Amino acid sequence: MKTYLFSIPTKKTDETSWVKPLNNYLLSIYGNTTEYQSDLEKFDKLRQDIRGVNPDNTGIKLYYNYYSQLELLDLRFPFSTVNRHKKVNFSWYDAFQPSVVHKQTALAFEKACVLFNLGALLSTYAGAKYEEAQRNSSIAAADETIKESLQIFQQTAGIYQFLNENFLHAPSNDLHQASVKFLVKLMLAQAQEVFVLKVISGDLEQNKNSLIAKLCQGTTNHYTECFNMVCNINKSGGGSSHDDFAVTDTNESVDDILGDDDDDDDLGDYNPEKSGEPQVTASIDSAWVATIHFKVQFYESLSHYFHGLQLEKNNKYGDSIAYLTKSQNILNEISSATLKAISKSGSNDSYELLDNYKYQKDAVGIKLTEMNKDNDFIYHDIIPSLITLPEIKPMDGVKTIPINNSKLFNDLNEYNYSNFFNNVVPINIHELLSFYSEEKSQFLRNELDLVDVSNEESASILEYLKMPKSLVNLKEIMNSSKHVDTMSTSSETNIDPGVRSIVNEVSSKYQTDMSNKDHISTIRKEIYNTITESESNLSGKFSESLIKYKDDLVRLKKSLIDASNSDNNLFGLINNDNSHLYAILGKGADSPEFKMLFNVDSQTSKKQSNNVENEISLLDIDDSQLSSSVNATDSIDSKIKSIEDILHDLNSIKNNKAKLVDTLKKEIHNDDISDILILNSKIKSTNEIKTVIFPEELKKFDPYGKELDNLIEQEKTFINELKNQWANLSDDPKVKEIQSSKQFQSNLIKHQTDKIIKFYNQNWKKYSLGLSAGVDFYNKLLAYARSLKQNIATAVNAPPQSSFNENFSNLNLGPQHSGPRAPPRPNQSYRPSYGDQSGTPQYNASHFSSNSPSLNHNLPPQYSQSSLHRSSTGGSFASHHSNESPGSYSRPPPALPPKRPSYSAQPTPHAPPQAPYTQFQPQASNYTDNSSSSANPTNLPQHPDSGTNDLIYNQPSTYQPNMYNFFSSN
């Protein structure tokens, strides 16, 4: 059985250019449209291509693609802004009245027309598939094609359903809501019809009569709804001028086609005012109305016919005859005008309907005659009244398929979203994304705060319990208690590596320091002997030329005394309190003596020897005591293992939290809902997006929050268990006993370490450096003493001078000086720092004044003119000569008292120079550099070159014989 299917006509359109309006908008926003030119050209070409497509896969794909890009254009471009400067005009012609054109600048009008044409193409394509199935000789291929046709009809209904729900104010009759709704019902009716015919043609054994009856009744209902919406079309015979739907006799009205009221009493059932259906405003062809009316009656007749066949199978012959009679009556009610209108529709398939009508009318008549005959002669079943027959329940086998469920449309949407103006994002979407980013950040901050608080709580508890250090120490103690022989070894391993390096440094210089100390004592004794011999040579000699050597000897001796005092303080750094420690450290870190410092056994040997008598003999210990000790140790080990497992679990939880937080950060960073916001920006307000979409999108992160909460709860459980088990372990008597011995060992190691470090910093470093500096100092002092001794011997053996006046006249004030060098002073490196030890002489090379050139002659660089000034404190000496040339040894004349008149006529002997150290007062305080009191003395005699008019030799003499008895003792 074959039927006639309607194909919706397409709307024609005029050419429209998209390039310039969109390019102007992009130029005003982005300033450069180079990257968008390709999309603009393709989009404009696609608009031109849809004007002449065929109803096939290619044409349908072009329309799907164009509509998809229109939707994206509406989402990415504010069309009101695009139309502000250069308006885009859309011209579309009415599908049922091609002469009527409608022009709009609204993008919604363009989308509605495109959807209408897409549905029209699909309806034509579905009809073509149905025709293909009828021509196909292969049953399997025909069935597959029929299924495809059914699918397309339902998709067409879905497209018109979407158009009906989203475009409410249509400017044309064909886009009016009633017209579009009529097309939805028509496509569903045709899909149901194709499905019914497929079931009928496949049920050769008539096993599905009941199902077919219900499906036919459903088809009747669909066409009834369609007819109710078009039965009021202009009864003057006006119809569409479209060629496919032209009616040959245009003078026939709908009343003529459907029959007079007398011939068709059922027209009252189709009163549109009673049905409540909206009336179609489009100019539907009258042939459509006639065909729809015919199908209403034809499928209602089929429904009663197949229901009667089913009753016959159930041996209900009376009821079967009644339904067959009703089926025959419905067929007879089809007016001749309706059949005439169908025959004049100009379509070849319309004749199939007339053939089906004739065939079904004959089949019902033959079957009804047979049933009446059998019932009259055999069954004698009562035939019920036709009015009392129950209604047949309808069944729908089809439904609308939404446009969003179309695989082709979804694929094109996905492709276009990533390739069609994908970089164009409206400003309002950027603002919404900023709000959403803040929501995500707040969610992340809340989770991070929970993690940080849990980590801090866990860390504080572990710190309070001193975990895991306390557990590690306890394990070491337990292992040490099991292996007593390794106690000393474990003590050695606990020694600070810094202490070992200190000990190695002390031991490496130990022999050198001892040698330097002995060398200092030897040289000091030799210097003293040299001074003694020099003094012996000068004893009893009062020559004026020897006075300067006596001064040098005094300074040399004073330097030796000061250096000796400094040596005593230096040697005092190693005293009876630390000499034993110094001797042990001098043997190195690997020596047994050093290791014994940290050995607990050696430190407690006395205590143990005193308590030997209190120890229990091994012979007195029975097996039960040994067994209880072993069991206690095993119990402690198991508790330690349990605590270790808890610590491992806590660490794993912490790592899992960190990993989960990192994953959450990445997910939040990569989360992009711009697509969702763009797609919903047209159908939801900003407030709805914030209050509905944002919370819904944030739910995707809830699993991370729940997982973090679970980890935190597990962490709290483990921490409570850890506290309980650690308290239980700490209260164990065996653990307390072992911890006390370990504490003694730790205290011993700390005490010895502090003692060694203190000795190293406060004693040995100063001691070693002082010895090295002292050796250098005494070597130079010895060289000076030997030189001075030789010069004295030469001067003593020299012939005496003639007279005082001759000596005075021959006094050499030039730069040459042949006398011995001044004794060196202890330099800076040989002046050890003793902290607050007052009264200790300290030596510094800077105490020698640069104003004493006689002391600087031939001295090493460190005792040159810039460093040989000696302060007036601590009994030190300084020379107060000024303005002398380097290398000379010229002394100013002493400030003699005025001459007395009684001695004016007598010759006065030459007075020896004044001793330089008479200007200073020795003190017991520290020897410090006091340049203010020694560098510029105020009452010193002036150099002879400083002013000849002020020389004392031109003044009256006040010489007294006993005023220079200072040297009489020498």
Curated annotation (Swiss-Prot):
It is found in: Cytoplasm; Endosome. GO terms for biological process: protein transport to vacuole involved in ubiquitin-dependent protein catabolic process via the multivesicular body sorting pathway. Residues 254-268 have a biased composition (Acidic residues). Residues 827-845, 862-880, 920-957 have a biased composition (Polar residues). Residues 803-813, 846-861 have a biased composition (Low complexity). Keywords: Cytoplasm, Endosome, Protein transport, Transport. GO terms for cellular component: endosome. Residues 4-458 form the BRO1 domain. Transmembrane segments: none annotated. Residues 891-900 have a biased composition (Pro residues). Involved in concentration and sorting of cargo proteins of the multivesicular body (MVB) for incorporation into intralumenal vesicles. Belongs to the BRO1 family. This is Vacuolar protein-sorting protein BRO1. It comes from Debaryomyces hansenii (strain ATCC 36239 / CBS 767 / BCRC 21394 / JCM 1990 / NBRC 0083 / IGC 2968) (Yeast). The gene is BRO1.
